[in-house]
Amino acid sequence: MSYTSCLKKHPMRLIFPYANSILRASLEKGSPQKLLMDYSTMRHFTTFCPDYRTYVLLLRACSKCSDIYATMQIHSHLTKVGLLRNQDIIAPLLRLYIDHDRMMEACELYWPMLEWSTDPFHGNLMLMGFLKEGQLDKAYQIFKRMPVKDLVSWNSMIAGAVRTSHLKDAMNLFSRLVNSGLVPDGFSFSSVLSACARAGARCYGVWVHQLMDEVGVEKNHLLISALVDMYAKCGRIAVSVEIFNSVKRKHLSTWNTMISSLAGHGLGSDVVMLFRRMELSGVVPDGVTFVALLTACSHCGMVEEARQYFETMTSKYSITPKVEHYGAMVDTLSRAGLLDEAYNLVMSMAVKPDAVIWRALLSACRRYHQTKLGDVTIEQIACQGSGDYTLLSNIYSSINRWDDSEEVWKEMKKKKVRKIKGLSWVELGGSTREFKAGDRSHPDSDDIYRVLHCLLKKAKAEGYTPSTELVTKDVSQEEREENLSFHSEKLAVAYSVLKTGPGTEILVSKNLQACGDCHEWMKIISKVLCRVIIMRDRVRFHRFESGCCSCKDYWINRGGIEYSVI
């Protein structure tokens, strides 16, 4: 006989003492819907008066069957009976709203709680809800008003800022955490190191590393990998190698991070050597390893090695290629001018090629003036972001199809797609200075432009000729040259020269890929100034020294040198 039948046939006095037990039995038998039905029957056929334990069971049932509407009804009952100050009830109710992305209802529940509860647990739940949706501003409003903040609160905000690319905010929050008197843990350090890596904040990253040693936090494989990644992305690849080599037992993720770091610096031969060490040590590579290996091959023009790795991952390690493996392989072939082979690989892929793969092929079509294949490739890309429109416009302008290029910009404007502005930045004295093309907003603008004009003059005396063919607008030669002269990375270099002494290494970060003109200019300037200039663009690092680049000019043209750190 079911509990519902019992309720209908037996007097209330026989059922009432066992009401919660009946409900709990339904839950334990894996029938949360039945629990809700039994409760409804009790309310309908008896004068049963639920207590806080009843509501705890009801909320557990709502959680198990994801019934948000029943949750809202229970919330209403709780308000009427005055149980919204019970800790055992408020937490599951809040979590139910957050799990179902009902943050408005969660806020209505949370704000009154601040009058009687200082427990950071509930605030941390709210932070989790907003950060899950990427709403850092709303999470910060919760964070500011939390009466008590524990380490979970700070870690949530720092990690959320990193995930939403608010890197300066992440570093500021970490500094505030340190000043609050709480001791950062491994999660705190790994999050802020990720922010330093992505922002290229070398000075801040070094301070964080020193603080790790002072605090005495245990350096597990996640923290070691974070340190390797941070130093590499801040232009200190030799320090990354030093940290990597200091670890006796290396986790797979640490090997992968080191290989990826070397790949980002274009150190192809070092990548090959490190992978051999990895195999000899008995560590079995995974799919991430081979993405890094193939990326290194793409950066360094190592076509044969790429073919070998692509074959080895399936034949030796039984790793099925994913779209990112195909993408790296297509990029390797495309950059080497093997467009037909790259296209054939795309057409034979076991998975559907994504837009990234088609863009790699399309970019190579522009570089090698393969307009027919370019037209075929264009049809496969539905322009989504500004990068797609820019690439398509550049292809047309490179073959003097100015009308078609202009049509692309008109279409972009019509669809209200905003072009991503190129930004470059440098970190000096612990503070970051950001520049955009033609930027005049800096307090030292007059001095920066004076230095830049001087550098341009010296570069031309050494043979630099502006690559005006790279300007994608049909304008005069003078306008083209002026357009190239004040690119953001040139301004960043001029600022660094202005603010640092002779011989000081210069590190410039850029959110887009550097243009060929700035690449050639920096080669010459490194020779003129007798300085090392390291430029980190969207794809990789370029180390300019004595008139040469570590990419061997492969990323732009051909020829050059390679250095090693292993």
PLM region spans:
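Short glycine- and Lys/Arg-enriched binding-loop motifs that mark or flank ligand-binding interfaces
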Residues: S156
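Terminal (and in a subset, N-terminal) low-complexity or junction segments at the ends
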Residues: M1-D150, A159-I566
